[in-house]
UniProtKB/Swiss-Prot annotation:
<feature type="region of interest" description="Disordered">
    <location>
        <begin position="418"/>
        <end position="455"/>
    </location>
</feature>
<feature type="zinc finger region" description="RING-type">
    <location>
        <begin position="50"/>
        <end position="88"/>
    </location>
</feature>
<feature type="domain" description="PDZ 2">
    <location>
        <begin position="339"/>
        <end position="422"/>
    </location>
</feature>
<feature type="region of interest" description="Disordered">
    <location>
        <begin position="198"/>
        <end position="224"/>
    </location>
</feature>
<feature type="short sequence motif" description="NPXY motif">
    <location>
        <begin position="208"/>
        <end position="211"/>
    </location>
</feature>
<dbReference type="InterPro" id="IPR051342">
    <property type="entry name" value="PDZ_scaffold"/>
</dbReference>
<dbReference type="GO" id="GO:0004842">
    <property type="term" value="F:ubiquitin-protein transferase activity"/>
</dbReference>
<dbReference type="GO" id="GO:0008270">
    <property type="term" value="F:zinc ion binding"/>
</dbReference>
<dbReference type="GO" id="GO:0005886">
    <property type="term" value="C:plasma membrane"/>
</dbReference>
<keyword id="KW-0862">Zinc</keyword>
<dbReference type="GO" id="GO:0030182">
    <property type="term" value="P:neuron differentiation"/>
</dbReference>
<dbReference type="InterPro" id="IPR017907">
    <property type="entry name" value="Znf_RING_CS"/>
</dbReference>
<keyword id="KW-0479">Metal-binding</keyword>
<dbReference type="Pfam" id="PF13923">
    <property type="entry name" value="zf-C3HC4_2"/>
</dbReference>
<dbReference type="GO" id="GO:0061351">
    <property type="term" value="P:neural precursor cell proliferation"/>
</dbReference>
<dbReference type="GO" id="GO:0030165">
    <property type="term" value="F:PDZ domain binding"/>
</dbReference>
<dbReference type="InterPro" id="IPR001478">
    <property type="entry name" value="PDZ"/>
</dbReference>
C-alpha cells in the first residue's frame, strides 16, 4: 500500500497514535499483517497496481488466470473467498506464483519519499528505503532512540511495581514496543524472539539475509556464507530449469573487470533463496564452462543455459584485514623452484598480478596476470604459480595481503621466489562449500585454470550505426513496437530503446527497426532527454501520422570466436518478439557519450579508513584509455552504507576532475588523500539479467 506525493502522509503527524505500530522497514504505522506504506513521488502505472488495495504491488503474486496482486492482499482475500477478485474464477492460494524478477525490479525502482519529512527530504528507490531508515535517516534514528528509552523506562517501572518477574511477551504475542518494529525490520537495539524470527524468515518476498544491510558491529562478526580470498565451488538447485537465476552480471574480457562479477542479487530469485552469493562475487566457472576470461555475452549465454543443477566456481575477494585461517599439510608433487626479478619504471607502477589463497594448502598463489602489466610482459610467471618469497620475506605461510604490502613497500626491483608444480593438482584448486545436494554422489568439478587476461578497447567490441527510417502506414495503425527506458526510469538513466517488434506490425513488415535499437528522434522531435511516459506519449502522438520518420541507433556487439565449437553453450534462437529479452550490459557501454547520463555521489567518512570500493581500469593496465570500473563494494564502509554505488559503475570524475586518461596508480592515491568527503561522478548501467 502507499500514497503519492500529493497525498503524502508524514509519520510525525500520526506516530503518537497507539493503535498502529511503527514499522522501521517502511517508516509508517501499520500492523504486521498489513502491507508496508510508502509515499510515492510520482503516479504509478496501472499495470503495477494491485486491484485489491489499489496501491503499487508489494511481493507480487501471479494467478493462473493472469492477474497480479500483492501477496498479503491476495492471502487475506482468499482466507475468506475461493475465487479471483477480478474475474471470480475459482482460485487456490497455492496455485499462485511469484511474479517475474523483471516485475520485482520495476517495483523496487519506484521512487518514494522519506516518511520523516520534517527532518529528511530525501527521495530514493523503494528498495533503498529500509537501508536509508537504518543507516542514514536522522528522523528514524531519533525515533528508535525514543522508543528504546520508553521501553526501558516502562520495563523498569513494571519491575519496581511487581514482586516477581513480569512476562512482557506471553506466548504467541508481542509487547506493544516489540510489535511497533514491524515485520522484517530488526533494529540494532532489539532482538527478535524465536517465535517471531521463524515467522519473519518464512515470509515470502523479504530480503534474503545474504544481502541484508549491516547495521551494527555484531553483524560483521557473523560467519560469512563463503570464504574470502578463496576459489570455491557451490551447487545451486532449481526445480524449473528455465527459470532465471535472479542476478545481474557485469564484466567480461571486453573490460578491465576481466571476470564476470555479480552486480545485484534480486530478492526471491534462485540465488537469493540459496543465500550464499553476494553482489561483488566473481563467477569463474559454470558446470564445465570456464568463464574466467571470456566475453560478457558468452558468459551470459553459459549462465542462461537451462539445467536443474548448477555448479558455480566463484571467488569472493577478501573484505576484512585480519581473518584467521588454517593451514593444512599438502602432499604436493615435485616442484620447480625459480627466481623472477621484475623491474618497475617507478615505485608506484603495478606488477599486474592477482594473488589469492587456497583452502587446503598454505601460501600465496597467482590467480591471474593482467595483459600489458609488468609480469605479463616479462612472461615467466603464470596462473597457479605459488609465491614462496618476495624480496627475501618468507611467504610459505603468508597471505595475499602481506604479499601486497611487501610489493607496495618495495622499490623499483621486486624479487620473487616461485614454485611451480610438476603437474596440476585438481584437488588443490577448488573447494566444495556447503553442498546442498541431497544425492549421495559427490560432484567434483573440473579443475579451474585461469586464462591470460586479454581485454581490448570497447570500441572494438561494440559498434553503433545511426539509421534514418521513414515508414508509411494507415492513420489508425500502430507502429508495432514496445519500448523501455527513459530519463529517470526504474532501471536507471537509460535512453529509450526497443524491447520487441511484434510480428504483423507496421515496423515488423518494414524490417529495419530491431530489438535493442535506441530511438533518438521521431518526426523531428528529440527523444533522448524525455522520461518514459513523455516518450511513449510522443510516440503515440506521432504514430497518428500517415508517415513516420524515425532516427535510431543500431547497437551491435562484435563477438570473437575464441572458444572451440564444442565449447560453445547451446543457445535458443531468439525472435524479435521474445518477451523474456533484456539488453546486455555491454550494449550500454558502447553508446556514444552524448547518451551517457552522469550523476554525482557524495561519500562521507568520520575516520581515515577506506572509502569501501576497489577499482580497475586506467591507462596503465592495458595501455589504452579504458574507463575506471568499480569491482568490489566492501562491507561496513561508507560506500556500502551509502548504497548507491554498484559493481560495474564507471567513475568518470573525482571532485570534478575528469579521470579520462588517468592511470590507476594516479587515481588510487588521489582517492586516499580525500579526508572526510569525496564526490564521485559515475555512470551506472544496469547489468545483464540471467
Amino acid at each position: 500500500m502507499g500514497t503519492t506525493s500529493d497525498e503524502m502522509v508524514s509519520v510525525e503527524q500520526t506516530s503518537s497514535s497507539s493503535l498502529n505500530p511503527l514499522c522501521f522497514e517502511c517508516g509508517q504505522q501499520h500492523w504486521t499483517r498489513e502491507n508496508h506504506l510508502y509515499n510515492y513521488q510520482n503516479e504509478v502505472d496501472d499495470d503495477l497496481v494491485c486491484h485489491i488495495c489499489l496501491q503499487p504491488l508489494l511481493q507480487p503474486l501471479d494467478t493462473p488466470c493472469g492477474h497480479t496482486f500483492c501477496y498479503k492482499c491476495l492471502r487475506n482475500f482468499l482466507q475468506e473467498k475461493d475465487f479471483c477478485p477480478l474475474d471470480r474464477k475459482r482460485l487456490h492460494f497455492k496455485l499462485c506464483k511469484k511474479s517475474s524478477i523483471l516485475v520485482h525490479k520495476l517495483l523496487d525502482k519506484l521512487l518514494v519519499l522519506c516518511p520523516f519529512s520534517s527532518v529528511c527530504k530525501d527521495v530514493m528507490q523503494r528498495c533503498d528505503l529500509e537501508a536509508h531508515l537504518k543507516n542514514r535517516c536522522p528522523g528514524a534514528s531519533h525515533r528508535r532512540v525514543a522508543l528504546e528509552r520508553r521501553k526501558t523506562s516502562r520495563t523498569q517501572a513494571e519491575i519496581e511495581n511487581e514482586n516477581g518477574p513480569t512476562l512482557l511477551d506471553p506466548a504467541g504475542t508481542l509487547s506493544p514496543e516489540a510489535d511497533c518494529l514491524g515485520t522484517g525490520a530488526v533494529p540494532v537495539e532489539r532482538h527478535l524472539t524465536s517465535a517471531s524470527l521463524s515467522t519473519w524468515s518464512e515470509e515470502p518476498g523479504l530480503d534474503n539475509p545474504a544481502f541484508e544491510e549491516s547495521a551494527g558491529a555484531d553483524t560483521t562478526q557473523q560467519p560469512l556464507s563463503l570464504p574470502e580470498g578463496e576459489i570455491t565451488t557451490i551447487e545451486i538447485h532449481r526445480s524449473n530449469p528455465y527459470i532465471q537465476l535472479g542476478i545481474s552480471i557485469v564484466g567480461g574480457n571486453e573490460t578491465p573487470l576481466i571476470n564476470i562479477v555479480i552486480q545485484e542479487v534480486y530478492r526471491d530469485g534462485v540465488i537469493a533463496r540459496d543465500g550464499r552469493l553476494l553482489a561483488g562475487d566473481q563467477i569463474l566457472q559454470v558446470n564445465n564452462y570456464n568463464i574466467s576470461n571470456v566475453s560478457h555475452n558468452y558468459a551470459r549465454a553459459v549462465l542462461s543455459q537451462p539445467c536443474n543443477t548448477l555448479h558455480l566456481t566463484v571467488l569472493r575477494e577478501r573484505r576484512f584485514g585480519n581473518r584467521a585461517h588454517n593451514h593444512s599439510d599438502s602432499n604436493s608433487p615435485r616442484e620447480e623452484i625459480f627466481q623472477v626479478a621484475l623491474h618497475k619504471r617507478d615505485s608506484g607502477e603495478q606488477l599486474g598480478i592477482k594473488l589469492v589463497r587456497r583452502t587446503d594448502e598454505p601460501g600465496v598463489f597467482i590467480l591471474d596476470l593482467l595483459e600489458g602489466g609488468l609480469a605479463a610482459q616479462d612472461g615467466r610467471l603464470s596462473s597457479n604459480d605459488r609465491v614462496l618469497a618476495i624480496n627475501g620475506h618468507d611467504l610459505k605461510y603468508g597471505t595475499p595481503e602481506l604479499a601486497a604490502q611487501i610489493i607496495q613497500a618495495s622499490g623499483e626491483r621486486v624479487n620473487l621466489t616461485i614454485a611451480r608444480p610438476g603437474k596440476p593438482q585438481p584437488g588443490n584448486t577448488i573447494r566444495e562449500a556447503g553442498n546442498h545436494s541431497s544425492s549421495s554422489q559427490h560432484h567434483t568439478p573440473p579443475p579451474y585454470y585461469s586464462r591470460p587476461s586479454s581485454h581490448k578497447d570497447l570500441t572494438q567490441c561494440v559498434t553503433c550505426q545511426e539509421k534514418h527510417i521513414t515508414v508509411k502506414k494507415e492513420p489508425h495503425e500502430s507502429l508495432g513496437m514496445t519500448v523501455a527506458g527513459g530519463r529517470g526510469s526504474k532501471s536507471g538513466e537509460l535512453p529509450i530503446f526497443v524491447t520487441s517488434v511484434p510480428p504483423h506490425g507496421c515496423l515488423a513488415r518494414d524490417g529495419r527497426i530491431k530489438r535493442g535499437d535506441v530511438l533518438l528522434n521521431i518526426n523531428g522531435i528529440d527523444l533522448t532527454n524525455l522520461s518514459h511516459s513523455e516518450a511513449v506519449a510522443m510516440l503515440k502522438a506521432s504514430a497518428a501520422s500517415p508517415a513516420v520518420a524515425l532516427k535510431a541507433l543500431e547497437v551491435q556487439i562484435v563477438e570473437e570466436a575464441t572458444q572451440n565449437a564444442e565449447e560453445q553453450p547451446s543457445t535458443f534462437s531468439e525472435n524479435e518478439y521474445d518477451a523474456s529479452w533484456s539488453p546486455s550490459w555491454v550494449m550500454w557501454l558502447g553508446l556514444p557519450s552524448t547518451l551517457h547520463s552522469c550523476h554525482d555521489i557524495v561519500l562521507r567518512r568520520s575516520y581515515l579508513g577506506s572509502w569501501g570500493f576497489s577499482i580497475v581500469g586506467g591507462y596503465e593496465e592495458n595501455h589504452t584509455n579504458q574507463p575506471f570500473f568499480i569491482k568490489t563494494i566492501v562491507l561496513g564502509t561508507p560506500a556500502y552504507y551509502d548504497g548507491r554505488l554498484k559493481c560495474g559503475d564507471m567513475i568518470v570524475a573525482v571532485n570534478g576532475l575528469s579521470t579520462v586518461g588517468m592511470s590507476h596508480s594516479a587515481l588510487v592515491p588521489m582517492l586516499k588523500e580525500q579526508r572526510n568527503k569525496v564526490t564521485l561522478t559515475v555512470i551506472c548501467w544496469p547489468g545483464s539479467l540471467v
